[in-house]
Amino acid sequence: YQVAKPAKVISFNSPKIKVLFAGQYNLYMQQDADMLIDCLIKSKDLSELKEHYVYTFLGKGWDNHVERLNKAGYETHHIKFAPDYIEEICKHDIQVTPICIGTGTKGKVLDAIANGLLVVGSWYALENIAVEHNVSCIQYEEIKDVVNILKKIHLNPSKYEAIAECGRENILQKHNGETTSKELFCLFK
């Protein structure tokens, strides 16, 4: 992972909380991303989700999702490529990661957490990462749960800012390449 210098200030206090979907729309996210967009559009509390959030999709293949959310009245943006990926993700508060297939540790998830974003993800998105639900990340069981999670976040932003900070500290400490290398090479002494 890469970390921005200076470190991002974790604060969900701008006019709207900025939600990021990062990575290509592909096999790993297709099923759950499609279901999440349907849930957002069909939500009974649509105005609440529109009023408090802006949604950005970073990566290729999200055109249909952006168009559908825009038609439903959401403030939605699409960035197909960011020349400085870390700088771009640091402009956001939350990263939703609807990965539905296990593939090991996710670099984009590590980047997000290490840079102070609150990651809301599936078990697959968070596998092999030193985080804990409701302590250093938010892990959902079913994709439809993300709608209720978003409703809770805007009602108590300081709680979720603290979770994001704990996540950042965990990643910087437990996924530190230099420390891990030293520990590994100590095994061979």
What are these regions (language model features)?
Residues 90-104, 115-117:
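Acidic donor-binding loop of glycosyltransferase active sites
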Residues 136-144, 152-157:
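Conserved acidic donor-binding segment of nucleotide-sugar-dependent glycosyltransferases
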